[in-house]
Amino acid sequence: MKVAADNLIWYGRNFDYQDVRYFSFSSSGFCLVMKGKKASAKILSDPQNCDKTTKGVIGVFVSEGNDTSWNSLPQEPTYRYSLENTENDCILFESEEEKVVTIRVIKFSEAPFGYAGLKSLEIEGNLNPDFLKDYQSNNQLKVEIIGDSITCGYGIEGVFNKDSFTTQQERADKSYAFLTAKLLNAKLQCCSWSGIGLVSKYVDENTINPDTVITMPLLWPYTDRQTQLKLGLEPSVWDESRFSPDLVIVHLGTNDASWVKKVVERRLLYVSAL
């Protein structure tokens, strides 16, 4: 049985292009509840634009039952996939016995690197007829977190002062942003990018001019600027009606501080950007 993207619960920002739904931000992804023996998906990515340290990574979490709240999310993924190919065949669930399960696919790696796009999803069984309606109609708190590497889960599985960055060590589901959403049982949307700031990216101490190649004012207004540019598309303005947060947390400033330092004019520029 083929499952359409519109029949899934979606986390985070996403967009459709040529019958593929792209989800590239940290903690974005989708969820379904099914009764059956198997679920599999074709996930697109762009390994040609990545090296071995920057390929997209997703985690698949399977829990028995039909609870779609974060309370039922396992601590560790059932499957973990590095998106090594342009088209990746991913098993999401497999069992010899028919079971009722909740399946969540979550983007572990962040938007600047390998993207993820759901091309197709097939199940051996049936979708729960009510899970999407129940999710859409509940009154869960909605939280949007705008942040940098901390929100992305940068280096969470790395060893401090030993390992160099790789997307294999990113775990958005263990970031403070995600853990906050879990504790609040809130619907979460993250717009985050490692090294980003409001007026400058992270720069070394000898840099005179700010690095404005990408700053949050250039990222947040758009649905998914990076992925759409990779696909040769004009970045679309994010439709805020798709997710109207009750709470917005802006966790930015660490990278700005590398350039702002204690220079008054720079501090005023940062404050004006808030």
Locate the predicted segments by residue.
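N-terminal secretory targeting modules
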Residues: 1-146, 150-172
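Conserved SGNH/GDSL esterase-like catalytic core that processes O-acyl groups on lipids
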Residues: 162-268
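Active-site neighborhood of glycoside hydrolase catalytic domains
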Residues: 270-274
